[in-house]
Amino acid sequence: MKEFDYSTVPHYKTYNFIKAVFKPIIKWVYHIKYKGLENVPDEGTKYIVAINHTCALDPVFVAAPKNVPPLHFMAKAELFKNPFAAWFMTRMYAFPVKRGKGDTSAIDYGEKIINEGHVMAICPEGKRIKDKDGVPQKAKAGVAIIAKATNASVLPVAICCNGKIKAGKHVTVSYGKLLSPEELGLDKEECSRRDIANAAGMIMDKITELWEAEVK
């Protein structure tokens, strides 16, 4: 895998073109429906998008609507081993994280994205959901660590489907209300590990609430 350049946040003109191509395809293949788009913050708001991890197309599902800004997605490093996949994902603003290794480069890059006025997206669970019903799983600390470091709010988003997502199934993407650092308990000068874990849990609870409202 070619070494990812964490030193600068890129801008690619191909992003909007790729987004425009994929939007009608996913609407047709997955009968996709969107809810809560009014909750997507206005430009200039500092926030992170947190999404349950259902399948490889999660970034496309969530970023497709017109009022959703470019999302810089944290994705597992293994996906970047294929040169074409790496080229494509980089131009969709994905960046690699080495899972389970305390990848500080990816965390620092996530903070850079937010502090430079862009929007980062992350799947708090850290891996794809294995449950056959698609039930969201427990969050890891990463999303709360980055939110604390950048004083960013968090937009919970749930990708909802009865069972595993596949062609022909109905998918709903539900955008929740923005969670502020104060609501998450991350506005303290110093946060303990418990504070971070509680904030990550609260974010995941909100995602699960959105999911349950559509699936159950």
Residue ranges and their predicted role:
Residues 1-13, 107-216:
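Non-catalytic C-terminal accessory region of glycerolipid acyltransferases
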Residues 2-36, 83-92:
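A transmembrane-helix-recognition feature enriched in membrane-embedded lipid enzymes
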Residues 22, 91-98, 126-130:
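Short, basic, glycine/proline-bearing loop/turn elements
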Residues 25-27, 66, 89, 113, ...:
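A generic structural signal for well-ordered alpha-helical segments
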Residues 28-35, 101-104, 157:
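Short gly/ser/thr-rich secondary-structure transition/capping motifs
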Residues 36, 52, 75-76, 93, ...:
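A secondary-structure boundary/capping signal
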Residues 38-42, 111-112:
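Short amphipathic alpha-helix with an adjacent loop that forms part of the alpha/beta core around
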Residues 42-101:
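Catalytic core of membrane glycerolipid acyltransferases/transacylases, capturing the structured
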